[in-house]
């Protein structure tokens, strides 16, 4: 009987660990007036290769969009130089090691640099991505932001990859 109880407890512990290694985040459109409608979800899950990112998103323009984990768990508008900016309350790119380098998901710079999201002609993004230097536990208490344009993972010719305005956001709790 003790073996059966031990097996049940081990099974419960294993299943609770599996749940801890996955987060589904609701993504909302954002603008300089605040958080707007839901445009989809992103599922983050741990794998032996890193963080697997499964987007199920719509309603953004076709093409590549910069995609990052940001410092703070907020999608709110904030003001900079007297101008209200969408999602600015999320802060900058998640950079816990203070590298101040923008090197992309495979580099050793900001841990918040994710692979670019590709939105298809029907305005959807569903292709899975991999961030090799992250795990689900790293994301808790931060926001994920989708930018207007592509990201070149460099600070030249524009800072932070030149992704442009923040268009969508989700808080990772």
Predicted regions and their residues:
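N-terminal leader/targeting pre-sequences
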Residues: 19-173
């Amino acid at each position: 009987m003790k073996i059966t109880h031990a097996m049940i407890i081990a099974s419960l512990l294993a299943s609770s660990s599996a749940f801890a290694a996955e987060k589904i985040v609701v993504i909302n459109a954002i603008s300089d007036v605040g958080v707007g409608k839901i445009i989809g979800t992103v599922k983050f899950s741990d794998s032996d290769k890193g963080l697997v990112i499964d987007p199920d998103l719509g309603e953004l323009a076709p093409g590549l969009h910069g995609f990052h984990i940001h410092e703070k768990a907020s999608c709110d508008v904030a003001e900079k130089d007297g101008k209200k900016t969408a999602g600015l309350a999320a802060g900058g790119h998640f950079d816990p090691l203070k590298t101040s380098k923008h090197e992309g998901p495979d580099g050793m710079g900001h841990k918040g640099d994710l692979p670019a999201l590709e939105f298809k002609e029907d305005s959807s993004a569903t292709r899975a991505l991999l961030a090799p230097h992250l795990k689900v536990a790293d994301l808790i208490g931060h926001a994920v932001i989708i930018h207007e344009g592509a990201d070149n993972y460099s600070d030249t010719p524009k800072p932070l990859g030149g992704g442009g305005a923040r268009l969508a956001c989700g808080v990772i709790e």
